[in-house]
């Protein structure tokens, strides 16, 4: 499931409750396209419906097979411990009111398996965790009033947690 999110405070929008935010695996900020590309998008939309150009890249059975392959990607105990330490740090951080849930921990483990697969490995490295931690978890945590008053972002807090957590050295299985 892919969704777009309007800026909070825009007319007709309300923040999603934590229980719904927690069901999205990853949150990415794409930003605006440059003017040249945006005009290409507009011109293309006027002459053709972009949905008419969409073609499937795999069928449902192939997708399920791919998911099975990804779930077999090996995660060393030291990497699991690393994930656990990062998650636990969000639950104890002085600027976080609501830390990462078990669902968020599972999402992080699944995402690092997918990233290792895309990188051509059958095992996860700590760098895989570092590379997706903020994108997978920033939308899941709730900052407290002190953080909001000081205009601290969830991304900044998670970056601090990453930098303050010792990364394990793991060798290939």
Regions found by a protein language model. Give the residues of each.
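Alpha-helix N-cap and coil->helix boundary residues
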Residues: 16, 37, 74, 78, ...
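Alpha-helix initiation/capping motif
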Residues: 17, 31, 56, 72-76, ...
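Conserved AAA+ ATPase small/helical "lid" subdomain
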Residues: 53-108
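Hydrophobic aliphatic residues
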Residues: 20, 42-46, 87, 133, ...
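C-terminal engagement/docking regions of AAA+ P-loop ATPases
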Residues: 92-173
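Canonical AAA+ ATPase core
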Residues: 1-73, 113-115
């Amino acid at each position: 499931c892919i969704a777009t999110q309007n800026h909070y405070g825009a007319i007709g929008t309300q923040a999603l409750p934590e229980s719904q935010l927690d069901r999205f695996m990853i949150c990415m900020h794409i930003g605006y396209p440059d003017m040249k590309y945006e005009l290409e998008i507009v011109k293309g939309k006027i002459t053709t419906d972009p949905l008419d150009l969409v073609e499937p890249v795999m069928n449902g059975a192939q997708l399920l097979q791919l998911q099975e392959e990804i779930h077999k990607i090996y995660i060393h105990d030291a990497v699991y411990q690393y994930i656990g330490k990062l998650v636990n740090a969000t639950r104890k951080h002085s600027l976080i009111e609501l830390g990462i849930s078990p669902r968020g921990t599972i999402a992080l483990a699944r995402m690092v398996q997918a990233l290792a697969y895309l990188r051509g490995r059958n095992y996860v490295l700590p760098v895989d965790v570092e590379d997706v931690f903020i994108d997978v978890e920033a939308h899941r945590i709730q900052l407290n009033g002190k953080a909001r008053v000081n205009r601290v972002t969830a991304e900044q807090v998670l970056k601090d947690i990453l930098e303050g957590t010792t990364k394990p050295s793991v060798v290939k299985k």
